[in-house]
Every structure is written in structure tokens, then in C-alpha cells.
Regions:
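Catalytic-core "active-site belt" of small-molecule-metabolizing enzymes
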Residues: 2-172
Length: 172
């Protein structure tokens, strides 16, 4: 892949992301393979200077992974300007794929200083709060449907907005 071309595509996607615009679809060679899509996503995220609210795991449904012939999900950054409080309105365009009900976990800061191996048992002690979340899923490109997991990955994880509910204290 040509770095100059990749940079040009990344600039278009970042511009669409920041200005809430819809652009022409990016070429399939950047989205067909998850490795190339990850590379594009990381380049795009490095060009954005807005604060990050957290991260999302995407492509976690096993049937979807099998259908798209992928082995593992990916993650993407969630930016603060895309996170809304409850009862806020969201503009939806025709390239919105739908909405998903998600669960959001607030993680304590000492999680990032933990030097031991993280397991299912000890991860619970790092969760401070849990809250419901509605994710508006869509593209910033004139594209319909999902042909590969790279389609979602390359477009900032296809997260348009997150609407957060009220947080509840997490009991271990």
C-alpha cells in the first residue's frame, strides 16, 4: 500500500469525522483485509486531537465473525464529542446501519498500573460503575451494508454516537 495514498484517504475520513460529513466510499483495498483497515483506523485516530472518552470492542458477535470469515474482534476509540447524555437527540442519515444496546463499564485508573495477568475473576475489582448505552452505528461514507469487518474498522469502528444512561455502582 502506498503511504501517500493511505494518508490521503485518512485525511478524507478524518475531515468527514470532524465536520460530520459523508464522503464517497474508500477503496476496497483498504477495507477488505482487517490488517489494512486497522492500519487506516490507527492512522486516522492519530490525526484527531480531540479527547478520548474510552474504547469500544466491535465485531464481538461470534456468528458475525464466522460469516465475515474473521478470527477476532477489534477495538476503536470513542471520542468525547460523540458521547451524549440521556434524552439528547441524534441526527440520523441514510448511511446509518442501526442502533445497538450496549453495556458501558467505567474502569478505575489503577487498572492501567496493574502488572499481573488480567483474568475474568480479577477484572471485576477494577469496574467502578456500569451503565446502559445506546450506540448509533453507521458510516461516514456513502456505503450501505457490511461486506467485511474492515468496513467497520476503517471507519472509526462505525460508531456515530453513544447515548449513555444513568450509571449504577458495580457490586463485585
Amino acid at each position: 500500500m502506498n503511504n501517500k495514498q493511505l494518508n490521503l484517504i485518512a485525511n478524507k475520513l478524518v475531515n468527514a469525522f470532524l465536520k460530520k460529513k459523508v464522503i464517497a466510499p474508500i477503496p476496497n483495498k483498504y477495507t477488505q483485509k482487517i490488517f489494512n483497515a486497522q492500519k487506516l483506523r490507527k492512522l486516522c485516530e492519530s490525526k484527531i486531537n480531540k479527547p478520548i472518552a474510552g474504547f469500544k470492542a466491535a465485531g464481538t458477535a461470534i456468528p458475525v465473525l464466522k460469516k465475515l470469515r474473521e478470527k477476532e474482534p477489534f477495538y476503536a476509540s470513542v471520542y468525547k464529542h460523540n458521547v451524549l447524555k440521556n434524552n439528547k437527540s441524534v441526527k440520523i442519515n441514510k448511511y446509518t446501519l442501526g442502533i445497538e444496546l450496549e453495556i458501558c463499564y467505567l474502569i478505575k485508573k489503577d487498572f492501567f498500573n496493574f502488572n499481573k495477568k488480567i483474568s475474568k475473576k480479577n477484572v471485576k475489582k477494577f469496574i467502578s460503575h456500569i451503565l446502559p448505552c445506546i450506540e448509533v452505528v453507521g458510516y461516514r461514507q456513502r456505503k450501505k451494508g457490511i461486506k467485511s469487518l474492515g468496513d467497520l474498522c476503517s471507519d472509526f469502528g462505525a460508531n456515530v454516537k453513544f447515548i449513555l444512561g444513568s450509571k449504577k455502582k458495580f457490586n463485585n
